[in-house]
UniProtKB/Swiss-Prot annotation:
One of its GO terms (cellular component) is R2TP complex. Belongs to the RuvB family. Gene3D superfamilies: 1.10.8.60, P-loop containing nucleotide triphosphate hydrolases, RuvB-like helicase, domain II. The lineage of its organism: Eukaryota, Fungi, Dikarya, Ascomycota, Pezizomycotina. This is RuvB-like helicase 2. It comes from the Eukaryota. It comes from Aspergillus fumigatus (strain ATCC MYA-4609 / CBS 101355 / FGSC A1100 / Af293) (Neosartorya fumigata). May form heterododecamers with RVB1. Component of the SWR1 chromatin remodeling complex, the INO80 chromatin remodeling complex, and of the R2TP complex. Its main location: nucleus. DNA helicase which participates in several chromatin remodeling complexes, including the SWR1 and the INO80 complexes. The SWR1 complex mediates the ATP-dependent exchange of histone H2A for the H2A variant HZT1 leading to transcriptional regulation of selected genes by chromatin remodeling. The INO80 complex remodels chromatin by shifting nucleosomes and is involved in DNA repair. Also involved in pre-rRNA processing. The keyword Aminoacyl-tRNA synthetase does not apply.
Length: 469
């Protein structure tokens, strides 16, 4: 007799696309809306009051449209929150103001020239708010009558639609009947019809028809029957970037390239025509230019040609605010033999407003690590948090933040509810920080492969000769 096979189902909760990144705990700059005074700890940011206030002032001018074509450099040692401040600015700007973030190394590509990549980044950071008025028919469908020809000719029909104040009958042609069938419009639906394009939008079911069926799908939405006139004029606002307009006009079916990302190089003639057209729309009051923000991280990785291009691009009529971050002191400018502060050419530094970030204090490191643990849904014991703070001070903040997760995994293995000091100590012994790694390399330098590929296998690990008796 066969033994029955038993199966045990195991389910794991996955986060999907909502993963925890290094700066996912940041919600804004954490400043007062009226006075722009930074709070000690707010919206995920801790400390760096001067840098945050400077960023808030820049942000305020961006929102008011009073500043464009300026360059700001956030300079400071590693692990002092330069990228975090930029992320806070992006969160505070909202979805309407374009914010483009890229690393300097992304500029260098075999498929695209450096100037084209920078041009596209600049154009992505400039928004165009286009206003258009359209006539819309909005109401509740009372009845749909469709007359189909016996010989297979054109279909004709009538649409009875109403608001709380009036009711009207419209004649429908073949295309409108097909659109109604496609959207599955029936009596009792509240719909919106754009007269210029013929687009039908199903807003939901009327509350008056809520008892028509005993069971309905989860996606069924009930709305009130519209009031007033059936035909109303609405102003619709679209916000697009100049780069999106460039891509759409650069080729036939260019809008498909927006989804595939294969934009390629766009000719300067196309951009000039778009600039002229946008300027016309602006004069006619149809469009409004929104200067956004372009953030370039690790800006010292750009070469002298890129800096020369940015110098010229900042003087153009359509230019965003360029915010850069660098952790270099005196460094060589890429593409030259010259050394300059922050790795930027001196003529470019003249045009830059510099915001400095300072190393975090012990208390600020403790608050940041506590926020990170809360974001990752990890409970830390007070002793574990104190040890992590000490590690953050003696090593760096990134390393201390990284071993929070590994300590949590070790605590889960022993079925603990919170991370203890023993878990942090075990993680510290398992994973090296940069200082201990350098010490290890120096101790075993002869056993590592050198620049020329040479390695000394006979060198003892502890420096003493091996004895075999």
């Amino acid at each position: 007799m066969a033994v029955p096979i038993s199966t045990v189902a195991e389910t794991k909760e996955l986060r999907g696309l909502n993963l925890i990144a290094a700066h996912s705990h940041i919600r804004g700059l954490g400043v007062d809306a009226d006075s722009l005074q930074p709070r000690t700890s707010s919206q995920g940011l801790v400390g760096q009051e001067k840098a945050r206030k400077a960023a808030a002032v820049i942000l305020q001018m961006v929102k008011e449209g009073k500043i464009a074509g300026r360059a700001v450099l956030i300079a400071g040692p590693p692990s002092t929150g330069k990228t975090a401040i930029a992320m806070g600015m992006a969160q505070s700007l909202g979805s309407d103001v374009p914010f483009t973030m890229l690393a300097a190394s992304e500029i260098f590509s075999m498929e695209m020239s450096k100037t084209e990549a920078l041009t596209q980044a600049f154009r992505k950071s400039i928004g165009v708010r286009i206003k258009e008025e359209s006539e819309i028919i909005e109401g509740e469908v009372v009845e749909i009558q469709v007359d189909r020809s016996v010989t297979g000719g054109n279909k004709q029909g009538k649409l009875t639609i109403k608001t709380t104040d009036m009711e009207t009958i419209y004649d429908m042609g073949t295309k409108m009947i097909d659109s109604m069938t496609k959207e599955r419009v029936m009596a009792g639906d509240v719909i919106s019809i754009d007269k210029s394009s013929g687009k039908i939008t199903k807003l939901g079911r009327s509350y008056a028809r809520s008892r028509d069926y005993d069971a309905m799908g989860a996606d069924t939405k009930f709305v009130q029957c519209p009031e007033g006139e059936l035909q109303v004029r609405k102003e619709i606002v679209h916000t697009v970037s100049l780069h999106e307009i460039d891509v759409i006009n650069s080729r036939t079916q260019g809008f498909l390239a927006l989804f595939s990302g294969d934009t390629g190089e766009i000719r300067s003639e196309v951009r000039d025509q778009i600039n002229t057209k946008v300027a016309e729309w602006k004069e006619e009051g149809k469009a409004e230019i929104i200067p956004g923000v372009l953030f370039i991280d690790e800006v010292h990785m750009l070469d002298i040609e890129c800096f020369s291009y940015i110098n010229r691009a900042l003087e153009a009529e359509l230019a965003p605010i360029v915010i850069m971050a660098s952790n270099r002191g005196q460094a060589r400018i890429r593409g030259t033999t010259y050394t300059s502060p922050h790795g930027l050419p001196l003529d470019f530094l003249d045009r830059v407003v510099i915001v400095s970030t300072q190393p975090y204090s012990g208390d600020e490191i403790r608050q940041i690590l506590a926020i990170r643990a809360q974001e990752e849904e990890i409970d830390l014991s007070p002793d574990a948090l104190a040890l992590l703070t000490k590690i953050g001070q003696e090593s760096n903040l990134r390393y201390a933040s990284n071993i929070i997760t590994t300590s949590h995994l070790l605590s889960q293995k022993r079925k603990a509810k919170e991370v203890s000091i023993d878990d942090v100590q075990r993680s510290y012994r398992l994973f090296y920080d940069p200082a201990r790694s350098v010490k290890f390399v120096n101790a075993y330098e002869q056993r590592f492969i050198g620049d020329q590929g040479a390695v000394n296998f006979s060198a003892p690990a502890n420096g003493d000769a091996m004895e075999i008796s």
